[in-house]
From Swiss-Prot:
InterPro entries: ICL/PEPM (IPR039556), Isocitrate_lyase_ph_CS (IPR018523), PrpB (IPR012695), Pyrv/PenolPyrv_kinase-like_dom (IPR015813), Pyrv_kinase-like_dom_sf (IPR040442). Belongs to the isocitrate lyase/PEP mutase superfamily. Methylisocitrate lyase family. NCBIfam families: prpB. This is 2-methylisocitrate lyase. Signal peptide: none annotated. It comes from the Bacteria. Mg(2+) binds at D92, D94. PROSITE patterns: ISOCITRATE_LYASE. One of its GO terms (biological process) is propionate catabolic process, 2-methylcitrate cycle. It comes from Bacillus subtilis (strain 168). Keywords: Lyase, Magnesium, Metal-binding. It catalyses: 3-hydroxybutane-1,2,3-tricarboxylate = pyruvate + succinate. Substrate binds at S53, G54, A55, C129, G130, R162, E192, N214, M215, T216, R245, R274.
Amino acid sequence: MSWIVNKQSSQEELAGRFRKLMSAPDILQIPGAHDGMAALLAKEAGFSAIYLSGAAYTASRGLPDLGIITSAEIAERAKDLVRAADLPLLVDIDTGFGGVLNAARTAREMLEARVAAVQMEDQQLPKKCGHLNGKQLVPIKEMAQKIKAIKQAAPSLIVVARTDARAQEGLDAAIKRSEAYIEAGADAIFPEALQAENEFRQFAERIPVPLLANMTEFGKTPYYRADEFEDMGFHMVIYPVTSLRAAAKACERMFGLMKEHGSQKEGLHDMQTRKELYDTISYYDYEALDKTIAKTVLPDE
């Protein structure tokens, strides 16, 4: 049913669902959804939560992931995803978009968008993708202050603290930072760019809160299955840019086909049909809002 007329979950309800999911015995798979259509397809596939990646969002706007977007911009996209799917959403808020006050403002914006959880990292600006070299980190105290500010500004918002320290300072330092972030109020920890099974297991042995793994493509982490992350002691796994990469490659192939053949006909088998599209976006639910609108009759495919 259309979100315009259907009762949707409150932020508190969505956060409560996310908290239960991340604490459940089975690992929580969280696919990235870079737009509303991807969010709907993730829900259709049976996922219980979705993720908004800063990298995927910026790329969807033709921009690099270098900290050049604003909190208001990503909050607007987050609102689209929650409206579309009514699923708990974990949002990548980079470094909090500035200092402590910026992090607090971001938290309030996420609350207004009905976001269930946020992920914040301990990099300095300009930040980089977590699987690239040359990252610089803020002091532990600064990251802890941001976490405290978020929890004060938006108590119901779940905070997943990401540390990029493994690459710059080593595994023990990453664990030490994580312990400080938990003390500051973080609800879960995201150790970025771990590179081997023993590293994941060490984190799980020493960190008492739910842990999130990043199964991005073309990164430093080997391609583990969800059940393998679960066996290593992790509670969540994200696939941050998968939807955008798949969509972009499909567009690239289709545009090449159109340019080569002067038509898209040869690629129709790779497209959503009109019926599939209408079913996904609940077209007829919207049309039913006005009984005077004639029901659309689909042409033969």
